[in-house]
Regions:
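The conserved Walker
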Residues: 40
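Conserved lysine of the Walker
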Residues: 44
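Conserved P-loop NTP-binding catalytic core
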Residues: 49-115
Length: 197
C-alpha cells in the first residue's frame, strides 16, 4: 500500500510470481493481515524476495534492468523450471477521479540463462476496471515480443504503437505522457513501495 498525506492511494490485493528462484506460479491474495507460514526451506523468503524484485524491476533505470535480468542467483535452477521466464503480476485497488478502480498490471521477461541468450521483456499488460459489479477490464497496455501498444484516449482502443527497448517497460516510458487519462495510475505504478514486517 502506498500512503500519501495520511490517505490510502494504492492497496495491493494479490501478487503472482513465477520463474524466480524455486517459485512456480505462486499467487498470494492479501487481506488486512496476511501471514506466510511454512516449514524452514519451503520458500517463504523467496516469495518476499520475488515481490520485492518485481517492484524494484519496475522502478529500476533502463540501464540497470539487463543486469537484473542476468542475475544468476535468481534464475531458477530446478531441473523442472530451468530456463523458465520470470513473471510478475499484481492486482491493486486505487482511486482515480474519486472512483475506485481495480488495476491488473503484469510483465514477463526471459532470463539471460547463458552467454548466448539475450534478456528481453516478452510480455507486458495493464488493465483497469471500475470496482463495481459487472464491470469488465479495459486494456491500456498490450505488449509482446513483436510490438508494444497502449491506449492513447479514453474512447479509443489499445492500438497506439510505442517504441521501447527490449529491456524497457512500457509503463516506464509512459511516465512522460502526462496527457493520458490514466497518467496518475502510471505514476503510482512507477513509485510503488512494498513494506513488510
Amino acid at each position: 500500500m502506498i500512503q500519501k498525506e495520511g490517505c490510502f492511494v494504492m492497496k495491493i490485493q494479490a501478487v503472482l510470481i513465477d520463474g524466480f528462484k524455486n517459485l512456480s506460479n505462486v499467487k498470494i491474495s492479501f487481506d488486512n493481515i496476511t501471514a506466510l507460514v511454512a516449514l524452514n526451506n519451503f520458500g517463504k523468503s523467496n516469495v518476499l524476495a520475488g515481490i520485492d524484485f518485481g517492484l524494484t524491476f519496475i522502478k529500476a533505470k533502463m540501464e540497470d534492468k539487463p543486469d537484473m535480468m542476468s542475475n544468476s542467483n535468481l534464475i531458477p535452477i530446478n531441473c523442472f523450471m530451468f530456463g523458465r521466464n520470470y513473471k510478475f503480476e499484481m492486482e491493486v485497488l486505487t482511486e482515480l477521479a474519486s472512483k475506485e478502480y481495480r488495476v491488473l498490471y503484469g510483465y514477463e521477461f526471459a532470463w539471460k540463462c547463458d552467454e548466448n541468450a539475450k534478456p528481453q521483456i516478452v510480455s507486458e499488460y495493464l488493465r483497469i476496471k471500475l470496482e463495481d459489479k459487472g464491470q469488465k477490464y479495459t486494456q491500456l497496455i498490450n505488449r509482446n515480443v513483436q510490438r508494444a501498444l497502449y491506449k492513447s484516449s479514453e474512447t479509443g482502443r489499445c492500438s497506439s504503437k510505442i517504441n521501447v527497448e527490449s529491456t524497457e517497460l512500457v509503463v516506464n516510458k509512459l511516465r512522460a505522457y502526462d496527457e493520458l487519462f490514466y497518467a496518475e495510475i502510471i505514476k503510482k505504478l512507477n513509485s510503488m513501495r512494498f513494506y513488510m514486517e
